[in-house]
């Protein structure tokens, strides 16, 4: 099977071409979380274990010296996936959409992985409970507090807001 080669600095040759596995499942809209900006929403009903969304990104080696990115997800000990600064808006990149899912301490999805037919190994969001059409998709970012951004540390400290 041939995959589109994803270089370290190039997320996709076709960054505005929707992924056929994902775009019938979710859409991006204004988040219901006041300070979050955009969010990811269900376009169909999901049951526990269903594939909800996909996250493709540039491939890079994990490093504590790199600039912090809220869009970087650890795939394994040797690989991170990141959405570059110039690809974070949906008018710049919308091939996959999981990077638009907001954080919650009581999420309706969890992280997963799959071998995608177009991109190879990618991160996924899998339903942890039933999700209804129109419901916002959330995931626990699970940041290590030693490297987490201030907003996340604040949420941990007060776990009554920020998606509890």
What spans do the regions from the language model cover?
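Glycine-rich phosphate/ribose-binding loops and adjacent secondary-structure elements
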Residues: 3
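Catalytic cores of histone-lysine modification enzymes
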Residues: 6-108, 158-163
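C-terminal SET catalytic tail plus cysteine-rich post-SET Zn-binding segment of SAM-dependent SET-domain
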Residues: 105-164
């Amino acid at each position: 099977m041939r995959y589109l080669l994803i270089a370290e600095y190039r997320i996709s040759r076709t960054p505005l071409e929707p992924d056929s596995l994902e775009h019938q499942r979710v859409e991006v809209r204004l988040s219901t979380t006041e300070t979050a900006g955009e969010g990811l929403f269900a376009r169909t009903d999901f049951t526990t274990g269903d594939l909800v969304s996909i996250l493709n990104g540039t491939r890079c080696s994990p490093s504590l010296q790199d600039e912090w990115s809220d869009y970087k997800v650890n795939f394994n000990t040797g690989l991170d996936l990141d959405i570059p600064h110039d690809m974070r808006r949906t008018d710049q990149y919308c091939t996959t959409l999981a990077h638009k899912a907001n954080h919650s301490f009581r999420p309706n999805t969890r992280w997963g992985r799959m071998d995608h037919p177009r991109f190879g190994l990618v991160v996924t969001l899998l339903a942890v409970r039933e999700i209804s059409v129109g419901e916002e998709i959330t995931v626990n970012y699970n940041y290590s507090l030693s490297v987490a951004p201030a907003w996340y540390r604040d949420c941990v400290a007060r776990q009554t807001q920020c998606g509890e």
